[in-house]
Every structure is written in structure tokens, then in C-alpha cells.
């Protein structure tokens, strides 16, 4: 893989189960509304104005990270960490397409819906006086 990877590059080596899970995850996300889906390094990003979730395809699972304005306590969440002052990153592991359902799909939809409101505002440079 030379240059910028594509979505196909990142998913080519997945097992059939993981490919099915990836396709279902992607289809589910596209139903949320307008967005940009693109490969970046070893991840596939899902973005409105900013990224609201991304997937890192691994050999045995899909590593999914999504961003919310609140922390979720659930056994499906493997890890959480602050992503900014207003955003908390949540990590789930997907190994089969049957996992791509509620509550994971609800959290992804929430991440899509709140991505604009939890965005860290751009810093405005103070105007010089005079």
C-alpha cells in the first residue's frame, strides 16, 4: 500500500464475518444523513464537519471509536477517554455483523447527531486595537 490508503485497502484482508460486519456498519452510518467517509492512515473516518466515529480494521475485530458529550457505562464499552473538553471517546469491538444493532447503532446515531454541538469552537483571534 503506497500513498494514501483507500477504504478497500483497509478492509481487503478482513475475514468474511468482519467484512459483513464492516458493510453493515457502513450501511447503518450512511442512513444517518449527509457525511464524508474516507480512509486516513489505518482508520476509516465518518465525518460531518468533524469526525464523529472511526473504524480501525484489525485481523480479528473492528476497533470502533465514537465521540459523545457524555460518558456511557456499559459492558460493551471497552474503554473511554476524554477526546477534548467536551467530547468523550468510546471504544467498542465488533467481531460479527449481529453486533451492529442497538445499543451500538444508537450510540453511533447519537454521535452523528451531537457532533456539531460538542465540537470545540475555533479560537477567534482578538482584534488589535487602533
PLM regions with names:
Residues 1-130:
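Charge-dense, helix-prone N-terminal extensions
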Amino acid at each position: 500500500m503506497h500513498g494514501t490508503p483507500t477504504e478497500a485497502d483497509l478492509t481487503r484482508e478482513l475475514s468474511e464475518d468482519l467484512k459483513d460486519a464492516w458493510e453493515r456498519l457502513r450501511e447503518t452510518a450512511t442512513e444517518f444523513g449527509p457525511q464524508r467517509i474516507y480512509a486516513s492512515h489505518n482508520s476509516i473516518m465518518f465525518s460531518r464537519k468533524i469526525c464523529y466515529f472511526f473504524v480501525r480494521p484489525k485481523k480479528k475485530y473492528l476497533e470502533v471509536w465514537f465521540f459523545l458529550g457524555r460518558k456511557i457505562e456499559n459492558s460493551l464499552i471497552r474503554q473511554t477517554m476524554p477526546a477534548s473538553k467536551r467530547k468523550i471517546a468510546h471504544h467498542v469491538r465488533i467481531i460479527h455483523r449481529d453486533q451492529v444493532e442497538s445499543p451500538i447503532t444508537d450510540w453511533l446515531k447519537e454521535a452523528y447527531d451531537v457532533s456539531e454541538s460538542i465540537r470545540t469552537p475555533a479560537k477567534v483571534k482578538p482584534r488589535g486595537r487602533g
